[in-house]
């Protein structure tokens, strides 16, 4: 099976050329501990990816807008990803659903005299609201994946 935990003292762990410096270290095999629990179905995650939001791409020429939304969300600690390609919104929603991403962000479309508002959709409930990447937050329980115990 292998080691679960190891560690020790290392006499010459680092050197500046003239002096050798000792160090200590420890390693925990969390994957070795969790693998049997996960394989028995006693633990699972609330979603398979860390992203809470998929930012849709209206058209490839608008990808920069979607990337800018993603940068704004990430700068505020909201894990997100940009759709891999511009496609019908239904396909982008299905992509998010397959990956377990609860929200899809639709950047507003630019018109000659203005830009439509961005909207975000909770694909579980179908609720869709106007949103601003500088202030919108998902519910706390959706921000990061969680561990779910079955016992």
Which residues does each PLM region occupy?
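TRNA-recognition modules of translation machinery and tRNA-sensing kinases, especially anticodon-binding
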Residues: 1-151
